[in-house]
From Swiss-Prot:
This is Metabotropic glutamate receptor 6. Glycans are attached at N290, N445, N473, N561. InterPro entries: ANF_lig-bd_rcpt, GPCR_3, GPCR_3_9-Cys_dom, GPCR_3_9-Cys_sf, GPCR_3__mGluR6, GPCR_3_C, GPCR_3_CS, GPCR_3_mtglu_rcpt. It comes from Mus musculus (Mouse). Disruption phenotype: Retinal cells from mutant mice display a subtly altered response to cycles of light and darkness, due to a failure of the ON bipolar cells in the retina to become depolarized in response to light. As a consequence, mutant mice display little or no pupillary contraction in adaptation to low light intensity. Besides, they exhibit strongly impaired responses to moving stimuli, and fail to produce a response when the visual constrast is low. Besides, rod bipolar cells from mutant mice lack TRPM1 channel activity.
Amino acid sequence: MGRLRVLLLWLAWWLSQAGIAHGAGSVRLAGGLTLGGLFPVHARGAAGRACGTLKKEQGVHRLEAMLYALDRINADPELLPGVRLGARLLDTCSRDTYALEQALSFVQALIRGRGDGEEASVRCPGGVPPLRAAPPERVVAVVGASASSVSIMVANVLRLFAIPQISYASTAPELSDSTRYDFFSRVVPPDSYQAQAMVDIVRALGWNYVSTLASEGNYGESGVEAFVQISREAGGVCIAQSIKIPREPKPGEFHKVIRRLMETPNARGIIIFANEDDIRRVLEATRQANLTGHFLWVGSDSWGSKISPILNLEEEAVGAITILPKRASIDGFDQYFMTRSLENNRRNIWFAEFWEENFNCKLTSSGGQSDDSTRKCTGEERIGQDSTYEQEGKVQFVIDAVYAIAHALHSMHQALCPGHTGLCPAMEPTDGRTLLHYIRAVRFNGSAGTPVMFNENGDAPGRYDIFQYQATNGSASSGGYQAVGQWAEALRLDMEALQWSGDPHEVPPSQCSLPCGPGERKKMVKGVPCCWHCEACDGYRFQVDEFTCEACPGHMRPTPNHTGCRPTPVVRLTWSSPWAALPLLLAVLGIMATTTIIATFMRHNDTPIVRASGRELSYVLLTGIFLIYAITFLMVAEPCAAVCASRRLLLGLGTTLSYSALLTKTNRIYRIFEQGKRSVTPPPFISPTSQLVITFGLTSLQVVGVIAWLGAQPPHSVIDYEEQRTVDPEQARGVLKCDMSDLSLIGCLGYSLLLMVTCTVYAIKARGVPETFNEAKPIGFTMYTTCIIWLAFVPIFFGTAQSAEKIYIQTTTLTVSLSLSASVSLGMLYVPKTYVILFHPEQNVQKRKRSLKKTSTMAAPPKSENSEDAK
């Protein structure tokens, strides 16, 4: 620090001797206390030149605002009475290094004061003292600079000499560091507030994926850094790309910027912290890339509500949202500035250049001639009448900065020079540290009526106006900036006032991923919290929240859009169902036929045909057939405890009763035939009573088993939601049924199927019985056909176990198979007999008796007769 200070002292002394930045390069006002001023009167020069073109608004307007403020303060008898404020106003040429050279002139008086002892000992040859230049003004405080990079460079010098500095435009967050920039203050809020406001705007617009664009330097880079940091802490906003525009951009640099931005086309929102020149060239590159309307700009206060960055580029700027520290147009300055002329404003050395630029004319200087191609200035032109005029946005803050110093000096004067008019010895010279204390303590209403104050870091409170550039009647060139909101610690954005290309009131998206539709969840991309893939909540899952899918409960299915669950419809086989038509038809016809046959047999109970068929077992068999047909109605009926109990009992009872009777009858025929081969003694248990006992004994096993089942597992109805849980939830149904599984159902029929197989075996064995045993072959054909029916039933029944129509197919298959097996028995064994009884009664007579001996001569000697076995 010591070496740097010595170096700066030497450099400042050399500049003072050389006369640099003194005289023609500055605006000077005499006064008891001198304020310094730094303004970007000219743009940065190119090709090695320090300064470029004149900046009418940012430069001249702001400089004149300081002169206007000084005039008002010096004319105010209540503020600093007896003290006149002077000024030394310099041009920074928008370059930090050049501004540093200029700012060194502010410390010349301090250097001279400290070097007087040394200079007194210096003598020229002959003892003549050296010639001295006029002593420079002692600058007590500095207003400026504009760009943050310039303010940082200057602040590093001014703090060494304890000269307070107040900026009217520098907003870099870096300048809030009071340990490094302890003599720096500003009447504009730092970019940390601005960045917070921009984050709030982005979130209010529903954007979560944006890119940032910054001019190289403290302002742009610090602003973007603050935005990124705040957005990261707030969450919900991701940065697609952060692009920096070089301080000295090469040809094609801005086309490269646009190409990089298009690498993430979904990030349409562009947060731009850039100077006016860079903003303009970015818009030009956008037009040349034919991307007008694609990017959605959110500009910082360097864009604000200025026309110059978007002049002739209005189409590209339509929809841009910009931010500007809350300000108001100062009417008094407008009146002051619009009355400035070449005659009454000779103190501003750059005003003639402004005049030529503003009126597009040329002044004739002494010894020269005006350019023939340019109109000659008359000097009678009027600002605002012969040229366009709009007050520059930072004029208010320049005035407030000057007044802040004046109020601080006034408070300091009252404290150090009580009752004294003019400066007192306590303020000569003015101590910079003491003045800084009073600056930080000021609080007054500024030129726009808003409070001016500083916090402990020298920052002003954050208050911003939010604008949007909007087309007028569809024309961008005739559009303008419209106020759409404010920010003061919280955002107030009028969404209805916003206008966009396309649908004027629909905010264009700037999102990494489009919002997921109903019934879809976000599957986040690792490492990019704002990007996701949409994954459908398919099957029986529904969307719980934007990140989660869950399965619906077993008794429910998802809504069509999978945003919730709804009860699964319950179905059953109804009487009106097409699936029930055929089983019911067969059952009705079967019951009618069975009833007719039973009635016929009972009416002709003592006729030879009825007697020969074995009346007792025939009635048992017909009863079983009747029950088989009747079970169809129980299978179609609505399931309940009583129906389910009846199904268990009757499902196997009818078939067991039928096949027990057929087995008993077939076994009797087989035993009689086999016994006849060996002897004439009849086999045991062939009487009708024995046959009934055997039949009911076989049937009782089924009854006992079912009763035990009913006791162990009481019947009840259930709703099975798995049976018709199809791939498509819309087709899912809950099935109301009895609590009988497929295996339970087969188990219920298993015993009767065993009897059927056994009966078939005996029928095969008895196939060689003589024709006198006339029922052997019909029974055989009955059993063969029945076996075929049940063999077909098994694959159909179990092959449809996974079908959505399972309840219908299986019930229909079972009932039809039962009815067909019953119909085969009825048709093979009793229809022919009934036909003879009803239509050929002449054949229902007892034929000649054949003795058992006669009948069995083919196998063994006769021993007895049995009229029941012959027709």
